[in-house]
């Protein structure tokens, strides 16, 4: 339910899972709670140097970036485009754009190299959800949604087919505060899995975006305290595992860095979570098995600011 502020203004709950602070009983109790949440001190993630060659020694030929921008217009005001220009991806995928296509900021025209731009947003909800895909090369084909009316009303999926692979960028529905959309999320997961399996049967698949789940305990800072919260319920984690097995797909980051902890892509704005690195890994590049020989690196750009998520980058040698 929306919450009301002091003057009666409606404040919408955010879509991302949040770790709520516990009530303070005393100064000593507050310090204890903080230590339990973040440990004795913040442990930050250091992104290692980019690996730009595949296991066979082939140089990377494709760079894809994905970023949940938490509002396209606000992200641009926070200099998000400056990071994009410096990173210089061949393909840029954006989630939670919260912007209809007829209201896109003019600043996007500055991305002259990413001239092929595709957008999807809800037809009846301005300022909600939405995804974008910007590409240097013109895709062979572009489509929107997963082909089921129940799941294609909120602008959550763009599919772009290229010569060597199909790219899907997605903003997966959040189960919501109090898990009010968990049942819907489970229906989505089943339909999305079926859709991706069909795509992957015809051409190698790259799936990227905010998939709104921390798969394993290593993928969030406070697993014990979030097992009943959106993004880490047993149902969502099981659905993600079934996606990996059924399509099948491989988590590119965990494939390369199986034991790397404190690597997160989302931090709530509350309680200085980002500076303390109390986060979640919700953003992924998932790859078909046949793409793995081309995998050079899968990066988490945790120092890039502009949203409550950070961008992620994939290098492929195709």
UniProtKB/Swiss-Prot annotation:
Cofactor binding note from Swiss-Prot or TrEMBL: Probably binds two magnesium or manganese ions per subunit.
Localization: Nucleus; Nucleus, Nucleolus; Nucleus speckle; Endoplasmic reticulum
Keyword Transmembrane: no
GO cellular component: cytoplasm; endoplasmic reticulum; mitochondrion; nuclear speck; nucleolus; nucleoplasm; nucleus; perinuclear region of cytoplasm
Site annotation Transition state stabilizer: residues: 212
EC number: 3.1.11.2, 3.1.21.-
Chain segments carrying region Necessary for interaction with NPM1 and for efficient rRNA binding: 23-33
Organism domain of life: Eukaryota
Record PTM S-nitrosocysteine, positions in chain: 65, 93, 310
Short motif (Nuclear export signal (NES)): ranges: 64-80
Ranges of biased composition (kind: Basic and acidic residues): 16-38
Induction: By several DNA damaging agents.
Family, per entry: Belongs to the DNA repair enzymes AP/ExoA family.
Protein name: DNA repair nuclease/redox regulator APEX1
Protein species of origin: Bos taurus
């Amino acid at each position: 339910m929306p919450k009301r502020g002091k003057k009666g203004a409606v404040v919408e709950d955010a879509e991302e899972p949040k770790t709520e602070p516990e009530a303070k009983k005393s100064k000593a109790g507050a310090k204890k709670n903080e230590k339990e949440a973040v440990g004795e001190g913040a442990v930050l993630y250091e992104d290692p140097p980019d690996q730009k060659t595949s296991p066979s020694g082939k140089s990377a030929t494709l760079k894809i970036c994905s970023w949940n921008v938490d509002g396209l217009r606000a992200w641009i005001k926070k200099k998000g485009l400056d990071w994009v220009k410096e990173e210089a991806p061949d393909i840029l995928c954006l989630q939670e754009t919260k912007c209809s296509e007829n209201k896109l900021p003019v600043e996007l025209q500055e991305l002259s190299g990413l001239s092929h731009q595709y957008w999807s947003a809800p037809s009846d909800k301005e300022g909600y959800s939405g995804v974008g895909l910007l590409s240097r090369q013109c895709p062979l084909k572009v489509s929107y949604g997963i082909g089921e009316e129940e799941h294609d009303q909120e602008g959550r999926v763009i599919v772009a087919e290229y010569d060597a692979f199909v790219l899907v960028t997605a903003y997966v529905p959040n189960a919501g505060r109090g898990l009010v959309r968990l049942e819907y999320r489970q229906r989505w997961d089943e339909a999305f899995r079926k859709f991706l399996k069909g795509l992957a049967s015809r051409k190698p698949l790259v799936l990227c975006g905010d998939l709104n789940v921390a798969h394993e305990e290593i993928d969030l800072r406070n697993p014990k305290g979030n097992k009943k919260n959106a993004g880490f319920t047993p149902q969502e984690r099981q659905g993600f595992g079934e996606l990996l097995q059924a399509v099948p797909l491989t988590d590119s980051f965990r494939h390369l860095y199986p034991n790397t902890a404190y690597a997160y892509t989302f931090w709530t704005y509350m309680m200085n979570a980002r500076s303390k690195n109390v986060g979640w890994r919700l953003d992924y590049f998932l790859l078909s098995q046949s793409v793995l020989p081309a995998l050079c690196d899968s990066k988490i750009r945790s120092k890039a600011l502009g949203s409550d998520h950070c961008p992620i980058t994939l290098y492929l040698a195709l």
